[in-house]
Amino acid sequence: MNNKIILRALLAAGVLGVSGLVFAHGDVTPQAVNTKGLPALGEEWLDENPYRAPSEHHDLAVQIGSSAYNQNCARCHGLEAISGGIAPDLRELEASYDGDEWYKERVINGAVRDGAVYMPRMADTLSQEALWAIRTYI
């Protein structure tokens, strides 16, 4: 009798634990980003991060990018880009043009494997200015 009660309690705790992980993932709907102060980049995507140092807009882009990252990316990629294992650790992203190329491809096209969406197409919702600001922050 006691074993059945203990088993049920463990099962209930396991279900609650898994439920908590599911709900902890949070809302992944992209949130608006205020890019006031950054120059307009136009509709055509740039190949290279326009805010990379020594750009005069670098510091503002980092500030905007930090806020935008925390609103839109941290749920999966972790605070300060330190992944908890759900998504790639963005600290390992190359800071050069090569990293820009990968980043641009990923934010425009997202990541879909076998029909499962691992990352939404962020460029459908966020502006190029906002996304390059996030890249600058990273």
Name each region found by the language model.
Residues 45, 57-80, 101-109:
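Sequence/structural segment immediately N-terminal to covalent heme-attachment motifs in c-type
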Residues 2-60, 137-138:
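Post-cleavage N-terminal segment of exported redox proteins
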Residues 18, 80, 94-97:
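Residues at alpha-helix boundaries and short interhelical turns
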Residues 85-90:
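Short cysteine/histidine-rich zinc-coordinating motifs and their immediately flanking basic loops
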Residues 28-32, 91-138:
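Extracytoplasmic electron-transfer domains, predominantly the class I c-type cytochrome c fold
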Residues 81-84, 115:
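Short amphipathic alpha-helical interaction/hinge segments
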